[in-house]
A protein has these predicted regions:
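Conserved catalytic or regulatory cores that recognize and/or transform ribose-phosphate-containing ligands
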Residues: 1-108
């Protein structure tokens, strides 16, 4: 049970592949029940590759860059980063997020 006297709950940013949406859901509820504020990806329950399939390659790249910048901003707000490495998988984008967190001093 969260401590009601806690001045501010810890802020946890979830990082991982959008292939594993169920892992994001599970981690989000577990962290919330542990009393943490959770920053995560926005999801429509569709993987990015499918969600943006109707956009041109240039639009897809621009959108990926925009979403990556937003996620780095979430990392900046977080007290820690929780990496969801389902089956040991950590993709290039997640490796970049981990490196960013480490460079900026956010514990991973």
């Amino acid at each position: 049970m969260p401590d009601p006297d806690l001045a501010r709950p810890r802020v946890v940013c979830l990082c991982g592949s959008t292939r594993f949406l169920d892992a994001f859901d599970a981690a989000s509820i577990l962290q919330t029940l542990a009393g943490n504020i959770v920053l995560s990806i926005a999801t429509t329950r569709t993987a990015d590759v499918d969600l943006f399939a109707d956009r041109s390659p240039a639009e897809q790249e621009e959108l990926r860059e925009h979403l990556a910048a937003l996620h780095r901003a979430k990392i900046d707000l977080a007290d820690e980063v929780l990496v969801l490495n389902v089956g040991g998988y950590i993709g290039a984008a997640t490796r970049g997020e981990i490196a960013y967190a480490e460079r900026t001093g956010t514990p991973v």
